[in-house]
Amino acid sequence: MLGVFNGTGPAQPLTMRAMLSEIAAGIQTEPRLTWVSTDFLKAQKVSPWRDLPVWIPGQGDWAGFARRDIRRALDAGLVFRPLPQTAADTLTYFKTLPQDRQEKLKAGLSAERETALLANWAAVADK
């Protein structure tokens, strides 16, 4: 491949549900997912990308994030690894890190914050 290409992936857009399903298949787990609204996440001051990696609201400053036409790159031969394989390999790598590094994630919600958010969501959703 020669030239300048946009190479965001995947080759076809994935919904959040489909992406999480493929990741779960790759790491051989059955997650229990709770879907909450973007408005709830914003009200709870959950930061896109940092608190919930890969979650980006589709409006405001984030509109169009990672949404590029990649047909030229695909036509030139760009291929993506299967997402389940990438997830499995990433988990394998993560498990090689020292325990203290595994416990200090640089992104994502802490277990305590996740629990609090889910409790807040349950209180709002029950109304």
For the regions a protein language model found, what residue spans apply to each?
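Aromatic-glycine-rich donor-binding/catalytic loop that engages nucleotide-sugar donors
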Residues: L74-L78
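Zn-dependent metallopeptidase/amidohydrolase metal-coordination segment
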Residues: L83
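Catalytic phosphate/metal-binding cores of nucleic-acid and nucleotide-processing enzymes, i.e., regions
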Residues: T86
